[in-house]
Regions:
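Acidic, Ser/Thr- and proline-rich intrinsically disordered linker/docking segments
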Residues: 74-75, 79-141
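A generic structural signal for solvent-exposed, polar alpha-helical segments
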Residues: 25, 31, 55-57, 82, ...
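Anionic N-terminal interaction surfaces
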Residues: 1-53
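Phosphoinositide-binding peripheral membrane targeting modules
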Residues: 42-95
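Short linear sequence motifs
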Residues: 2, 12, 18, 69, ...
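Low-complexity, intrinsically disordered short peptide segments enriched in small/polar/basic residues
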Residues: 2, 9-10, 19, 58, ...
Length: 141
């Protein structure tokens, strides 16, 4: 599984081997209101997240739970972003605002139970390293 994650990342990210990797997900919550029925619907997007401490860059690559393919990478360079911080509530997420028009919330985990919705990979050490990088080198707060 780890090799498949690495292969997908390296295939779409130039100099991908220079990045450390974790898997995570982002949630897109759509609010709806149809008269008496209202609520929200959440879409889960799986991500391969790479970070390079030297260039202070995070790259998010969308993927699917079975890692059968991936989308185009999005680069978040520390000197180009508007702000970045770790959000503890309601979920533990790494929030990056590339500009005033939008943001990405990266949720990462040591392990998960639901392998149909998420990429499953035990990643305690990698997550600790990413958290330290984000807090110490990338966060704007």
């Amino acid at each position: 599984m780890r090799k498949k994650v690495r292969a997908l990342f390296d295939q779409v990210v130039e100099n991908g081997e220079k990045y450390r990797l974790i898997v995570g997900y982002t949630e897109d919550v759509k609010r709806f209101n149809y008269g008496f029925v209202h609520g929200s619907k959440t879409q889960i997007g799986n991500l391969i997240v790479g970070w390079n401490e030297d260039t202070k860059t995070i790259v998010a690559v969308p993927t699917v739970p079975d890692l059968s393919g991936c989308g185009d990478p999005t680069y978040y360079r520390r000197e180009e972003i508007l702000k970045a911080y770790r959000n503890k509530y309601p979920t533990d997420a790494f929030i990056i605002y590339p500009d005033r028009n939008g943001y990405i919330g990266i949720n990462a985990y040591e392990w998960l139970d639901d392998e149909k919705l998420y990429v499953y990979l035990y990643q305690k050490e990698e997550l600790e390293a990413f958290t330290a990088f984000f807090q110490n080198s990338f966060s704007t707060k």
